């Protein structure tokens, strides 16, 4: 009799050529995509060159996205990008994305149809878990793992245990995927899902857009998880239309699959949520925030730089001005999102409100460039991490929130609910 498995276990078993896997088992799985960026790929290239091979395992299944320090912020980052550009050309890697066609990797990869339901994907970036929104097993790895993946098309894994999140009910207005995942991390902690799979189910999924799901899956790593994953449904299938010719594979968890925990969440009871410094678990609902003034507002990133995020922010900012002295930085997730935001008039809205709109980049999120904080400064940001010094000076502060709360806070000059400015 076949033993029951979770979504993640079924995908891993399929890619390992096994009928069944269980938590804790060590396996070797075939990979559908190996991903790197301009920070992690140079190290992977050096490791690759020591492996005695001159070819990547599949020119179509390696993707390199220069996004962290691009457009190049200094000579060192320019040299890194030159190195990986030459490597991609020499290995005839088809999915190397130059800055004119690039985006923040975890917004770009799904947009380009390179993540397909049922895939196993590794990326030398911790937020590779984003693609779980599409029913993909995807996880971050080190640069040497990326090198081995590029050479062999394989990676080894310890099959994770799973936590089942049963989402029920309809979220209230202004409650988004960001608020849901911040609520979850606040509840279980930054190590609450350590090396576990966060698997989402329940009737509440029908109210979550694909952009909401990308946000929730993106921040699985902030709870210490190996991956986050959603079941494939009509919304997934609709999103994938026209993006890939590859077969979509649906792996549903067995009803009697084993979970280390089952957590039920009534989405209708949630409120807009803010993570205070210096951990994503340090959450408060918007009515508990109090008087917190901010210097900078950042809207974008691989967490919240998609069209729905920009539309929500623009709907609050339209016809209004941000408070004098506040710096508003908006960075769309990809060039296509940027273009669509221009065509819809969202870019005009942001600029007329007093903000700037940046090319797609990871820059501000990791304290790299395009919006660094000085000593004592405070930012509210739609990004995913608020560790000490994450966005600049060690004595600066980062508050994590949704695009709606961030946009409202830009107008008020302090952290507020959208209702307070509308």
UniProtKB/Swiss-Prot annotation:
**What catalytic activity does the UniProt entry give for this protein?**
(2R,3S)-3-isopropylmalate = (2S)-2-isopropylmalate
Subunit note: Heterodimer of LeuC and LeuD.
Q: Could you tell me which CDD domains the record lists for this protein?
A: IPMI
Name it.
3-isopropylmalate dehydratase large subunit
Protein source organism: Clostridium acetobutylicum (strain ATCC 824 / DSM 792 / JCM 1419 / IAM 19013 / LMG 5710 / NBRC 13948 / NRRL B-527 / VKM B-1787 / 2291 / W)
Which cofactors does the annotated protein need, by name?
A: [4Fe-4S] cluster
Which Pfam families does this chain map to?
Aconitase
MF annotations from Gene Ontology: 3-isopropylmalate dehydratase activity; 4 iron, 4 sulfur cluster binding; metal ion binding
């Amino acid at each position: 009799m076949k033993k029951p498995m979770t979504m993640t276990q079924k995908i891993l078993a399929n890619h390992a050529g096994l009928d069944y896997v269980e938590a804790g088992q060590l396996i070797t799985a075939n990979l559908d995509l190996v991903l790197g960026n301009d920070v992690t790929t140079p190290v992977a290239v050096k490791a690759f060159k020591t492996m005695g091979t001159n070819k990547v395992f599949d020119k179509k299944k390696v993707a390199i996205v220069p996004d962290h320090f691009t457009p190049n912020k200094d000579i060192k980052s320019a040299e890194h990008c030159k190195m990986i550009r030459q490597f991609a050309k020499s290995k005839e890697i088809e999915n190397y994305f130059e800055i004119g066609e690039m985006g923040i990797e975890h917004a770009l990869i799904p947009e380009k149809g390179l993540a397909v339901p049922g895939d196993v994907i590794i990326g030398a970036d911790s937020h590779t878990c984003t693609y779980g929104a599409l029913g993909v097993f995807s996880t971050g790895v080190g640069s040497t793992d990326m090198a081995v993946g590029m050479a062999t098309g394989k990676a080894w894994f310890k099959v994770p245990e799973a936590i089942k999140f049963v989402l029920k009910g309809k979220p209230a207005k202004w409650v988004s995927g960001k608020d849901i995942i911040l609520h979850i991390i606040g509840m279980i902690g930054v190590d609450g899902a350590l090396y576990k799979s966060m698997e989402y189910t329940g009737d509440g999924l029908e109210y979550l857009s694909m952009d909401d799901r990308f946000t929730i899956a993106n921040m699985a790593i902030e709870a210490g998880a190996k991956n986050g994953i959603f079941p494939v449904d009509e919304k997934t299938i609709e999103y994938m239309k026209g993006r890939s010719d590859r077969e979509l594979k649906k792996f549903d968890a067995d009803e009697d699959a084993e979970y280390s925990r089952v957590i039920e969440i009534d989405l209708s009871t949630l409120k807009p949520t803010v993570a205070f410094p210096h951990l994503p678990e340090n959450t408060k609902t918007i009515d508990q925030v109090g008087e917190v003034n901010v210097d900078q507002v950042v809207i974008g990133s691989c967490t919240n730089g998609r069209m729905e995020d920009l539309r929500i922010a623009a709907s609050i900012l339209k016809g209004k001005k941000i408070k004098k002295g506040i710096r508003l930085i908006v960075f769309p997730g990809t060039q296509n999102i940027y273009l669509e935001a221009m065509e819809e008039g969202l870019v005009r809205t942001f600029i007329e409100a007093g903000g700037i709109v940046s090319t797609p980049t990871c820059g501000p999120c990791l304290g790299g460039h395009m919006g660094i904080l000085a000593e004592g400064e405070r930012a509210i940001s739609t990004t995913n991490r608020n560790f000490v010094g994450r966005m600049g000076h060690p004595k600066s502060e980062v508050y994590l929130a949704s695009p709606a709360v961030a946009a409202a806070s830009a107008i008020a000059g302090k952290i507020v609910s959208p209702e307070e400015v509308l």
